């Protein structure tokens, strides 16, 4: 299975600049409706969708590009969470609280300039193996 990541934005050039600076991504192919960004383990497609347009034919929700909650967001694994946060802030992200530490690593919760949630994760020690249940049995 291949994974493609689509991110709705209302300002394509601003989004290209943000994701290029914050995540080190580069433009691959360009389309009438957006661009492909390369440099992550999966391609990311920035899709131009105007604010206020219907998000889905099955929903009355409208697109908005201020901070919003969604159950799906990007977690980006980085070598240095502090450096990654600095780059993202410089590019226009918002840090939502302190960088948190746990025995598995550190996490910074952020929002991109379009209100989408984004986390930076720096694994330490054995990463998520530090908190995995023995024998992978259900709790």
Question: What are these regions, as identified by a protein language model?
Answer:
Residues 1-4, 26-75, 83-111, 122-139:
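Vicinal oxygen chelate
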Residues 15-20, 88, 115:
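Conserved active-site tyrosine of GNAT-family acetyltransferases
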Residues 117-120:
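Short glycine-/small-residue motifs
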């Amino acid at each position: 299975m291949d994974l493609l990541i689509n991110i709705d934005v209302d300002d394509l050039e601003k989004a290209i600049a943000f994701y290029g600076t914050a995540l080190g991504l580069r433009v691959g192919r360009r389309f009438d409706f957006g661009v492909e960004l390369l440099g992550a383990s999966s391609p990311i497609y920035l899709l131009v969708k105007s604010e206020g347009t219907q998000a889905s034919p099955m929903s009355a929700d409208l697109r908005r590009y201020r901070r919003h909650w969604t159950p799906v967001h990007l977690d980006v694994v980085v070598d240095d969470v502090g450096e990654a946060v600095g780059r993202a802030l410089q590019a226009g992200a918002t840090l939502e609280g302190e960088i948190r530490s746990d025995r598995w690593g550190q996490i910074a919760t952020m929002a991109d300039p379009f209100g989408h949630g984004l986390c930076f994760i720096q694994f330490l020690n054995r990463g998520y193996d530090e908190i995995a249940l023995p024998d992978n049995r259900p709790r």
